[in-house]
From Swiss-Prot:
Pfam families: Prenyltransf. The keyword Calcium does not apply. PROSITE patterns: UPP_SYNTHASE. Its EC number is 2.5.1.31. InterPro entries: UPP_synth-like, UPP_synth-like_CS, UPP_synth-like_sf. Belongs to the UPP synthase family. Catalyzes the sequential condensation of isopentenyl diphosphate (IPP) with (2E,6E)-farnesyl diphosphate (E,E-FPP) to yield (2Z,6Z,10Z,14Z,18Z,22Z,26Z,30Z,34E,38E)-undecaprenyl diphosphate (di-trans,octa-cis-UPP). UPP is the precursor of glycosyl carrier lipid in the biosynthesis of bacterial cell wall polysaccharide components such as peptidoglycan and lipopolysaccharide. The active site is at D14, N62. The keyword Nuclease does not apply. This is Ditrans,polycis-undecaprenyl-diphosphate synthase ((2E,6E)-farnesyl-diphosphate specific). Signal peptide: none annotated.
């Protein structure tokens, strides 16, 4: 493709459970199948030299799912990290994790820290795995940090603007997403990157995540390329 490409893509990987249930399989089989789609999309981003890919792996609301499913997801995440980290590193991928790590197991937290440390200097692609995250949590946490900076005398109230506030978000240092993709037919962002998606192009597809392949990714990119991003301004044709 010769058309313009997004540099940061954020994805809500929805429909693993529904994919499995539609095939008469346990929901956990859908989560396993979803890992294959993750690998495919990472490879697509590498081929197209996209700078950053954010994957919404587990939201703060997902704790309300059945305990057995939550435990399986955490074990699957840990296992995938251990299994794939060397390959990700060899391909020049830098791993980052966004979200509240405190409720996660110490073993998982250490694996995340080690993965970030190992890949810190890689530059081919930033793979931002979003775990135990909520957009409201991110904004509230950022506000608390900002207040402490003001009280500590490190920041004056008059210095606070949107750019300064963004530095206190958990995504600090990353560009805001150009393209948001959500699979499985849900038409909402579900408390994901509430601040960061202000001017992001939204793309929704009925395809469940395990069926989201290279062709489906191309369709999303084609849709993005056809859009005129105005950022609140008037386009040149108007």
């Amino acid at each position: 493709m010769n058309h313009k490409l997004p540099q940061h893509i954020a994805v809500v990987m929805d429909g693993n459970g529904r994919w499995a249930e539609s095939r008469g399989l346990p929901r956990v089989e859908g989560h396993k199948a979803g890992l294959d789609s993750v690998k495919k999309i990472i490879n697509c981003c590498l081929e197209k030299k996209i700078s950053c890919l954010s994957l919404f792996a587990f939201s703060s609301e997902n704790w309300s799912r059945p305990v057995t499913e939550v435990n399986f997801l955490m074990e699957l995440f840990l296992e995938a990290l251990r299994k794939e980290i060397d390959d990700l590193n060899q391909h020049g991928i830098r791993l980052k994790f966004t979200g509240d790590r405190e409720p996660l197991s110490q073993v998982l937290q250490k694996q995340m820290y080690d993965a970030e440390a190992l890949t810190r200097n890689n530059q081919q692609l930033i793979l931002n795995v979003v775990v135990n995250y909520g957009g409201k949590w991110d904004i509230v946490t950022a506000a608390k940090k900002l207040i402490h900076s003001v009280l500590d005398g490190k920041l004056a109230c008059d210095e606070i603007n949107e750019a300064v506030f963004a530095q206190f978000l958990d995504t600090s240092g990353m560009p805001e997403p150009d393209l948001f993709i959500r699979t499985s037919g849900e038409l909402r962002i579900s408390n994901f990157f509430l601040w960061q998606l202000a001017y992001t192009e939204l793309y929704f597809t009925d395809v469940h995540w395990p069926d989201f392949n290279e062709h489906e990714f191309e369709l999303a990119l084609t849709s993005f390329a056809r859009r005129a991003r105005r950022f609140g301004q008037i386009s040149q044709s108007e």
